[in-house]
Amino acid sequence: MSVVTMKELLEAGAHFGHQVKRWNPKMKKYIFAERNGIHIIDLQKTVKGIEEAYEFLKTVSAEGGSILFVGTKKQAQDAIQEEAKRAGVFYVNHRWLGGMLTNFATVRKSVEKWQRIEQMKEDGTLYLHTKKEIAKYEKERQKLELNLIGIKDMMEIPKAIFIVDIKKEKIAVEEAIKLGIPIAAIVDTNCDPDLVDYVIPGNDDAIRAIKLITSKMADAILEGKEIFMKKLEEEAEKAAIKEKILQEEEYQKSMDEYIEE
């Protein structure tokens, strides 16, 4: 059974590209036709792209790898947050701070700073400061929370990244490429597909299209996690059996020694 159907993509408006004059010629092989000055994306290629990205993210997840969802444009913010939370992965849906990947240690320090302010708020020490200082701390806390809440528990560089609109998320793309992190992304007709490892040709402006494709990526991760958990259970079971055998051998050995005495 296919991960997604042409009908679903059509209903979500995933086939609408940008104006012809804004196209990137490298997207030519993903374009089906031109209608009223708008490029129409070949949805057969979209289905194939989704299936390939699905398998990739499922594999990463099945191996226990962490994944990051990125989409800061207004149309993508809700889908990115909702689907990342559903799949239990990290996300950035407000602002990509330069160095989020390439200067990860500094980002971790920002997370720690935010958590310190949160702690001050909880234990009441924040309110020992002047009103002006409290207002300053609160403003900083809100800003840090908005930008970092989706990655606060991310302790290392992710093994894969899923992006909505690689043109908008240019810095995220550059950082991932620099670090050799594979990218799966929705790539519209005005973008360069060569920057992406797993190209999903599609409309990166339509809320329904973004939601549909992002939900499929989340499904892939959840499927991979099931495989990973099953693997862990099997390994734990094997370890328990091995431990039991060793205990029995030790017991038998001690009994043999007792009999000999």
From Swiss-Prot:
Gene3D superfamilies: Glucose-6-phosphate isomerase like protein, domain 1 (3.40.50.10490), Helix hairpin bin (1.10.287.610)
Signal peptide, first to last residue: none
One Pfam family of this chain: Ribosomal_S2
GO cellular component, one term: cytosolic small ribosomal subunit
Keyword Ribosomal protein: yes
The keyword Ribosomal protein is annotated on this UniProt entry: yes
Gene transcribed to yield this protein: rpsB
Transmembrane segment boundaries: none
NCBIfam families recorded: rpsB_bact (TIGR01011)
Entry protein name: Small ribosomal subunit protein uS2
InterPro entries: Ribosomal_uS2, Ribosomal_uS2_bac/mit/plastid, Ribosomal_uS2_CS, Ribosomal_uS2_flav_dom_sf
Family per record: Belongs to the universal ribosomal protein uS2 family.
Organism phylogeny: Bacteria, Pseudomonadati, Nitrospirota, Thermodesulfovibrionia, Thermodesulfovibrionales
